[in-house]
C-alpha cells in the first residue's frame, strides 16, 4: 500500500511542475499566486513533518513540495522578466541549490526548466517527460547503492518511474 501512495506522489510531483509551467501564462496576478503557494506551503509544513515523525517526536524533515513549487514559480518569474542568459542560468542554479532543503530537491526545478524549454512543442514536451523519467530513475538508482542489492535496486528504480512515466502518458 505504501508503494501505491509513493507512486501517486511520483505522478503528482512531475504533474504539478508541468501544470505550473503551463498555467503560469494564465495567472492574472503573479504576486497573489506566489502568496497562495507560500500560504499553502506554511500550512502544510507541520503535517508534512508529522508524516515523517518517528518515535512520537516531531522533527524537521525538510520543506514540503509546496515550497519547492514556490521556488519553481520563482524560476518562471525570472525567465519571464529577463532575457539575460547569465542571470537566468544563475537564478536556475541558485534555485536548484535552494531546493536541496525541500522535497523533490533538484528534480522539481530541473523538471520546471525542461517544461519551460519544451513549451509549445509536443515533441519537446514528450522528450522532457522522457528525460524527467530517466533522471528520476537515475536518482533512485543512485540513492539505493549500498542500501539494496543490485537486483533489488534496479527493480526499485524501474518501479519508481511508473508514476512519473504515467504522468507523461496522461
Residue positions per predicted region:
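Alpha-helical transmembrane segments and their immediate juxtamembrane cytosolic regions
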Residues: 1-170
Amino acid at each position: 500500500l505504501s508503494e501505491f501512495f509513493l507512486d501517486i506522489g511520483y505522478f503528482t510531483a512531475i504533474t504539478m511542475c508541468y501544470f505550473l509551467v503551463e498555467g503560469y501564462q494564465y495567472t492574472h496576478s503573479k504576486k497573489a499566486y506566489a502568496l497562495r503557494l507560500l500560504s499553502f506551503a506554511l500550512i502544510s509544513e507541520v503535517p508534512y513533518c508529522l508524516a515523517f515523525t518517528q518515535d512520537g517526536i516531531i522533527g524537521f524533515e525538510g520543506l514540503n513540495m509546496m515550497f519547492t513549487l514556490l521556488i519553481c514559480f520563482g524560476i518562471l518569474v525570472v525567465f519571464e522578466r529577463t532575457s539575460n542568459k547569465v542571470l537566468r542560468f544563475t537564478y536556475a542554479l541558485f534555485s536548484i541549490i535552494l531546493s536541496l532543503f525541500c522535497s523533490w530537491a533538484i528534480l522539481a526545478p530541473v523538471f520546471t526548466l525542461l517544461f519551460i524549454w519544451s513549451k509549445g512543442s509536443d515533441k519537446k514536451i514528450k522528450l522532457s517527460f522522457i528525460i524527467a523519467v530517466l533522471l528520476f530513475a537515475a536518482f533512485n538508482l543512485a540513492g539505493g547503492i549500498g542500501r539494496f542489492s543490485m537486483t533489488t535496486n534496479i527493480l526499485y528504480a524501474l518501479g519508481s518511474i511508473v508514476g512519473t512515466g504515467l504522468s507523461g502518458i496522461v
